[in-house]
Design a protein with these regions (language model features):
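Secretory targeting and sorting signals
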Residues: 1-11
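Extracytoplasmic cell-surface/polysaccharide-interacting catalytic and binding patches
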Residues: 11-84, 89-194, 203-222
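Conserved metal-phosphate-binding beta-hairpin within the catalytic cores
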Residues: 199
Length: 222
């Protein structure tokens, strides 16, 4: 989710690209629980730039995710996304939150074993995110009733236990992580090893552009 990415050649662009689409218009069967559009996230509040609880992605990434969903459904599961395109203003909000030592209301759920002042130095929070380029998605597996499966940790858990291949994760959680990774890898998604939920579609449609338009259906050009 919050990997450090190069800002060389980055363009902070407040105008949406015509190559974005709401995921629901591409595959409405994929579940959406857009965490930063509500208070259930590590900041404890709606995050700047999230005007609607919708997933927006560059079109090639959205189509690839739909292909992965077909395979996951065939296996008796479904995909659920937590975050997709993320405006730069949201990333800036994360950095401000991480720098506010007084606000610790979400520590027990999201970062119980790391001090808040270590979140930036240890790479959990960064000044740039691949999500702002539009081809990265935070995603998990659910059963067909849309109940999330055991993945070993919650989403956005700032801890080495969230590393995709952490050896302490065994049994069903290990099987679920491996299934998620293999299904997405087959469609061109690359996992971030430090976060089991974080995948980037390659090649990216906008590899050098960090967008800042708000998350809303109206912000995406037809």
């Amino acid at each position: 989710m919050l990997a450090v990415v190069s800002c060389v050649g980055a363009l902070l662009n407040g105008v949406p690209a015509p190559g974005f689409a709401p995921l629901a218009h591409v595959d409405p069967s994929i579940g959406q629980d857009m965490r930063y559009a509500g208070p259930h996230n590590f900041t404890g509040a709606v995050v700047d730039g999230y005007e609607e609880p919708v997933c927006l992605l560059a079109r090639p990434a959205a189509r690839a995710l739909a292909r992965a969903q077909r395979e996951v459904l065939r296996r008796g599961y479904s995909l659920l996304v937590y975050d997709c395109y993320r405006p730069q203003r949201a990333v800036d909000r994360f950095v401000r939150w991480a720098s506010d030592g007084a606000e610790r209301s979400t520590k027990a759920e999201f970062y119980p074993r790391v001090e808040k002042d270590r979140l930036i130095p240890e790479g959990y929070i960064a000044e740039r995110s691949g999500h702002s380029r539009g081809s990265t998605v935070d995603v998990t597996l659910t059963d067909l009733r849309r109940e999330p499966l055991d993945m070993g940790t919650p989403f956005d858990f700032f801890d080495p236990l969230a590393h995709t291949d952490d050896p302490r994760v065994t049994g069903p959680a290990r099987e679920h992580r491996d299934l998620l990774r293999s299904a997405l890898a087959a469609q061109g998604f690359v996992n971030l090893p430090e976060e089991w939920w974080h995948f980037t579609y390659k090649p990216e449609a906008f590899p050098d552009t960090y967008f800042d338009f708000p998350v809303s259906v109206a912000a995406v050009r037809p």
